[in-house]
Amino acid sequence: MIKGTHWPNLVSKSYTDACETSKVMDFNFIFAHMYCADMSTDGKLQAGVRAAAFGLVDDKHFELYKRRIENALFRYRDQCDGNAAPPARLSDNGDCCHHFVRDAARVVESIKSVEATSVGINVIVLLPYLKQLQIALKMLSDAFACCAKTIGGLQMYVQDLLSHCLLYADRVEAAGRALQVMNLFLNSGGPLYECDLCKEASADPRFLKPKECCQYSLCYACCVALWKTASTHAKCPACSTSFKS
């Protein structure tokens, strides 16, 4: 066992947590091929990846029932599309919606089939849709007391799977933190972009505002602060050139 001032106690809780994290790192993620360098800043791309997870459920629904998930209440609505909020009511025209219970049961059966074929961490892709489905089932529960047993069973399954996904989510976040530390060793010689005003630095070249006048480096946060305090136009702190609006 290695102990000392530079190496962690291998039986410590942090080491145990690290072992759990390593289990998350060693996987073949189902959507790894959808990676793009702009993923962290491209909302449309992010929505497309999350929608691909719903596509797995929709495809399974078609395989089982020879039809897509057509009920709007159970279609995936992404937060980046501006229509993530669930419908205010089951029907806008007063039509009977009792068949929604059957539709929900079919959706849940499709999810069960997807879950059965999902290896390890891959089940986490269902998390956004499960949160949405949980709200939809609550609406059905409030509307149809006569189907309380059926709807209650669907809610129980969704809640259990949601809890399972959230457990993996915690591990993924821990893995993300570990990877950030590991990347320090891979990119130890990479450039740092430092703001000459606030002295903050980042490895992301987008941290700094493009230079328009002199060689003075300014981050976007400082640029915004200068605009807020300027009477007319913000000016470069070094050469006093007015920035473009």
Swiss-Prot record:
Matches recorded under Pfam families: Baculo_IE-1
Domain of life: Viruses
ZnF region ranges: RING-type: 195-240
GO molecular function, one term: zinc ion binding
Keywords attached to this entry: Early protein, Metal-binding, Zinc, Zinc-finger
Keyword Ribonucleoprotein attached: no
Protein name as it appears in the record: Immediate-early protein IE-0
